[in-house]
UniProtKB/Swiss-Prot annotation:
<feature type="binding site">
    <location>
        <position position="171"/>
    </location>
    <ligand>
        <name>Cu cation A2</name>
    </ligand>
</feature>
<keyword id="KW-0472">Membrane</keyword>
<dbReference type="InterPro" id="IPR036257">
    <property type="entry name" value="Cyt_c_oxidase_su2_TM_sf"/>
</dbReference>
<keyword id="KW-1278">Translocase</keyword>
<feature type="binding site">
    <location>
        <position position="163"/>
    </location>
    <ligand>
        <name>Cu cation A2</name>
    </ligand>
</feature>
<dbReference type="InterPro" id="IPR045187">
    <property type="entry name" value="CcO_II"/>
</dbReference>
<dbReference type="Pfam" id="PF00116">
    <property type="entry name" value="COX2"/>
</dbReference>
<keyword id="KW-0249">Electron transport</keyword>
<keyword id="KW-0479">Metal-binding</keyword>
<feature type="transmembrane region" description="Helical; Name=I">
    <location>
        <begin position="1"/>
        <end position="13"/>
    </location>
</feature>
<dbReference type="InterPro" id="IPR001505">
    <property type="entry name" value="Copper_CuA"/>
</dbReference>
<dbReference type="GO" id="GO:0045277">
    <property type="term" value="C:respiratory chain complex IV"/>
</dbReference>
<feature type="topological domain" description="Mitochondrial matrix">
    <location>
        <begin position="14"/>
        <end position="26"/>
    </location>
</feature>
<dbReference type="Pfam" id="PF02790">
    <property type="entry name" value="COX2_TM"/>
</dbReference>
<comment type="function">
    <text>Component of the cytochrome c oxidase, the last enzyme in the mitochondrial electron transport chain which drives oxidative phosphorylation. The respiratory chain contains 3 multisubunit complexes succinate dehydrogenase (complex II, CII), ubiquinol-cytochrome c oxidoreductase (cytochrome b-c1 complex, complex III, CIII) and cytochrome c oxidase (complex IV, CIV), that cooperate to transfer electrons derived from NADH and succinate to molecular oxygen, creating an electrochemical gradient over the inner membrane that drives transmembrane transport and the ATP synthase.</text>
</comment>
<dbReference type="GO" id="GO:0004129">
    <property type="term" value="F:cytochrome-c oxidase activity"/>
</dbReference>
<keyword id="KW-0496">Mitochondrion</keyword>
């Protein structure tokens, strides 16, 4: 819209349909300034509203709290009682054959597939960032502040990510592994983990 207006006014000037006093006048400069500003405002207002609407999930099926520490992640399933764990990277010397070096963890985040998941992200010490690129998720973890993001997995699988904020010497040793499973498997996993943590 802005380019069209500029090209239209430029073509009028080149065809000399505007008088010489209009070309040098302030009216044209005023139009070139105000009209693009109005167009930008008309584009920005609905965009900002949609941006904030996309950030909110009305009723997620599961809420997960991810807390970044130097240099591991803590997870709390807030919809379950006593379902929390720490997730550390598996050292290369202890890594089973066939697993990814620097990406495998001792406790994966397990979520049910085809369910809206809300992730509340914070940090306990310094800035971190909870990022899983294949899910389109990246949220900064800031001490004393709760940020949120959401995602839905459409297929079972394992999704890898890492802390994407330089947070110290072992920054590259903070992998994130999200495992998407069918609902029945998730329910059995959560009940097994809840019963083992209560012992």
């Amino acid at each position: 819209a802005i380019c069209s207006l500029v090209l239209y006014l430029l073509s009028l000037m080149l065809m000399e349909k505007l008088s010489s006093n209009t070309v040098d006048a302030q009216e044209v400069e005023l139009i070139w300034t105000i009209l693009p500003a109005i167009v930008l405002i008309l584009l920005a207002l609905p965009s900002l509203q949609i941006l904030y609407m996309m950030d909110e999930i009305d009723e997620p099926d599961l809420t997960l709290k991810a807390i970044g520490h130097q240099w591991y992640w803590s997870y709390e399933y807030t919809d379950f009682k006593d379902l929390a764990f720490d997730s550390y990277m598996i050292p290369t010397t202890e890594l089973p054959s066939g697993h990814f070096r620097l990406l495998e963890v001792d406790h994966r985040v397990v979520v049910p597939m085809e369910s809206p998941i809300r992730v509340i992200v914070t940090a306990g010490d310094v800035l971190h960032s909870w990022a899983v690129p294949t899910l389109g998720v990246k949220t900064d973890a800031i001490p004393g502040r709760l940020n949120q993001t959401s995602f839905i997995t459409t297929r079972p699988g394992i999704f890898y990510g890492q802390c994407s904020e330089i947070c110290g010497a072992n920054h590259s040793y903070m992998p994130i592994v999200v495992e998407s499973t069918p609902l029945a498997h998730f329910e059995s996993w959560s009940s097994l983990l809840s019963s083992s943590s209560s012992l």
